Amino acid sequence: MSHGPLRVGIGGPVGAGKTTLTEKLCAALAHRCSMAVITNDIYTREDAEALMRAQVLPAERIRGVETGGCPHTAIREDASINLAAVADLRRTFPDLDLILIESGGDNLAATFSPELADLTIYVIDTAAGQDIPRKRGPGLARSDLLVVNKIDLAPHVGVDLARLEADTQAARGQRPYVMARMRAGVGVEAIVAFLEREGGLQLLPQD
């Protein structure tokens, strides 16, 4: 691509499964394209360290950014710290095809600057409650792809999954969504297909 690697922003509340999604995408794609990850944490680099421990990418392809008290600012109003990390990765790996940018945990209003992310994926947690899709924050309603994660927990937390999906459809309109269980890898293929289709990501054939 003429403007460099596809940059995909991954957002969502704390505990929704952003780091698990990032880990699963790395496991699925690292052998099929040149990729890297930037994680945003408020005061630590815990998410970056978790990915390094999982060994889904070489450590030098993972950057941890400490955002301070307002993680949404670092992905929208002042994305300079993340843009600097993107530039550093591109200098180090000129052949990059894909950069995943994981936001710090935030609320339903968090969105990525178009300057930072070409596509946005927003992750919500089924266990957070039946009414989450009806709240329709910008991340949920306007992200390029919504991932409804942990659907296996629905019966344990009193969530009607069929109603949750109907409310998700109503909130999303024509925009795509995936019902997922990231920890088990359910939904990963659909997300990869989305990146190919909407992001023009070109992948090597699977082994």
UniProtKB/Swiss-Prot annotation:
Binding site for GTP: 12-19
InterPro entries for this protein: CobW/HypB/UreG_nucleotide-bd, P-loop_NTPase, UreG
GO cellular component: cytoplasm
GO MF terms, alphabetically ordered: GTP binding; GTPase activity; nickel cation binding
Keywords for this protein: Chaperone, Cytoplasm, GTP-binding, Nickel insertion, Nucleotide-binding
Listed Gene3D superfamilies: P-loop containing nucleotide triphosphate hydrolases
Disulfide-bonded cysteines: none
Subcellular location: Cytoplasm
Superkingdom as given in the UniProt entry: Bacteria
Regions annotated as coiled coil: none
Main localization of the protein described in the UniProt heading: cytoplasm
GO BP field: urea catabolic process
Oligomeric and partner information: Homodimer. UreD, UreF and UreG form a complex that acts as a GTP-hydrolysis-dependent molecular chaperone, activating the urease apoprotein by helping to assemble the nickel containing metallocenter of UreC. The UreE protein probably delivers the nickel.
HAMAP family for the chain: UreG
Similarity field: Belongs to the SIMIBI class G3E GTPase family. UreG subfamily.
Function recorded in the entry: Facilitates the functional incorporation of the urease nickel metallocenter. This process requires GTP hydrolysis, probably effectuated by UreG.
Identification of the protein by name: Urease accessory protein UreG
Organism the protein comes from: Cereibacter sphaeroides (strain ATCC 17023 / DSM 158 / JCM 6121 / CCUG 31486 / LMG 2827 / NBRC 12203 / NCIMB 8253 / ATH 2.4.1.)
